[in-house]
């Protein structure tokens, strides 16, 4: 026989034990405790979506959910941001019980679609890391349909080419200057960031909350003064992750993006990191060429209509 488990809403006082739990469960994420803190904060508006499973008074499982409001492009969506079950308590139905209860709560709140996918601007993963095989099996046996794949690339910061002096001098001669973001950039930079669409402006805003800001920009003189033409951020959601980044289409091919990328990775190396992850990677060849990045983690996204 297995010991019965009970489900209740998790509270702030549970956090120390929950950090220990996720560190044991998320074996492919060394910063699991930080991941929990990030997702816990994002669920603050609906704390009832933080559910804890206990056996004999000890935490053995956790789910953190969220509700995304309906938009012109998507229905109200329930998000399953995290499911973790202690290794010693797996295969007892705890994960399924937590998932079912979270689904019931977001459905009662109005969700007509469920997703297991990164929820920008503040997210921990693009989807389920396929190495968490039990999580993949749980999603697929619970009626979720696999969607797009997300890829991360890894960079060995100890050996990657991170020097930018010569390229910065070349760009400066062409009128493009690369520098770190500053607090004084906040208003004009975030106004410029809205042109990119999506949620990159939210991620960039978070980069500005750190001291020093975790981002770099490329600027040049325009008709109305200094204008931004490129940006890159790091450590926005997870300390070891890089992104987002973008360069004005008119300047692509000049090496602006490579300089911005290398500057951010140099920051991470200076902060004591040996490895960096490029999250939700798009142009694989660009990163492989620029910093010798290599393909690493694979994530599957899942959705289910209610």
Residue ranges and their predicted role:
Residues 85, 91-104, 108, 247, ...:
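Conserved acetyl-CoA-binding loop-helix of GNAT-fold acetyltransferases
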Residues 61, 148-151, 229-230:
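A structural microfeature
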Residues 2, 100-172, 299-305:
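Acyl-donor-binding surface of acyltransferase catalytic domains
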Residues 253, 260-306:
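Short hairpin/turn module used for nucleic-acid contact or packing/dimerization
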Residues 80-90, 119-122, 245-253, 282:
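A short, internal acetyl-CoA/4′-phosphopantetheine-binding micro-motif in the GNAT/acyltransferase core
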Residues 23, 29-50, 55, 63-74, ...:
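A conserved beta-strand-loop-helix scaffold within acyl/acetyltransferase catalytic domains
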Residues 68-80, 90, 109-112, 235-245, ...:
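A conserved beta-turn-beta hairpin within the catalytic core of GNAT-like acetyltransferases
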Residues 1-39, 46, 50-54, 59, ...:
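Short amphipathic alpha-helix that is part of the acyltransferase structural core
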